[in-house]
């Protein structure tokens, strides 16, 4: 199930999921977490966006654009706000990365997503990565389970598979 941070945490707290893959795990829930690979967050734009013509794009430039961001409480949104100082209250909130990418493709604004979620679109030049400090913001993906939950043999094997096959060097 692909969902937002709030729902992932609810699933962990209430033992609705054996394992989750997420960004930064919270400290207020007893969890066992292992970082599995880097997760670079990038700024993306429509290929004809004027910012792509600038030699140096700044956060000040981004403030003049329509910003497409995840909902309040999203790990991506929290990270982007923390690292950039951007305030998204007056911009467009979208509840999925796929919808953000589609909105960027339609020329509706600048989006912030995991590079892993847009490799194909970048390769096909459907969207472009904006070169703006402090992006890419490199976080980690974590594989997480509740500390008090006993993992089934299948869940243990899957966890080990993820850890063994998502080495940081392979994906950045």
Regions flagged by a language model, labelled:
Residues 1-29, 94:
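Central regulatory/effector-binding core of bacterial HTH transcription factors
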Residues 12-13, 62, 80, 102-109, ...:
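Hydrophobic residues within well-ordered alpha-helices
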Residues 12-22, 41, 104-111, 126-127:
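Alpha-to-beta junction loops
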Residues 30-67:
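Flexible hinge/capping segments at coil-to-helix
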Residues 32-42, 124-138:
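Short beta-strand->loop
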Residues 48-58, 74, 148-154:
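Short helix-loop capping/hinge motifs at secondary-structure junctions, enriched
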Residues 65-86, 151-159, 168-172:
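Secondary-structure junction motif
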Residues 130-171:
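A late-sequence structural motif
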């Amino acid at each position: 199930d692909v969902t937002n941070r709030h729902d992932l945490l609810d699933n962990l707290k209430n033992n609705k999921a054996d394992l989750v893959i997420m960004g930064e795990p919270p400290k207020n829930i007893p969890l066992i977490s292992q970082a599995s690979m880097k997760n670079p967050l990038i700024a993306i734009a429509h290929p004809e966006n004027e910012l792509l013509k600038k030699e140096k794009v700044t956060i000040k430039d981004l403030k003049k654009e329509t910003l497409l961001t995840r909902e309040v409480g999203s790990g991506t949104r929290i990270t982007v706000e923390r690292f950039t100082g951007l305030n998204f209250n007056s911009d467009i909130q979208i509840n999925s990365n796929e919808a953000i990418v589609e909105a960027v493709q339609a020329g509706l604004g600048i989006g912030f997503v995991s590079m892993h979620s847009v490799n194909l679109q970048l390769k096909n030049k459907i969207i472009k990565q904006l070169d703006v400090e402090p992006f890419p913001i490199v976080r980690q993906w974590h594989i997480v389970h509740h500390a008090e939950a006993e993992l089934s043999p299948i869940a243990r094997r899957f966890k080990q598979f993820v850890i063994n096959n998502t080495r940081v060097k392979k994906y950045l």
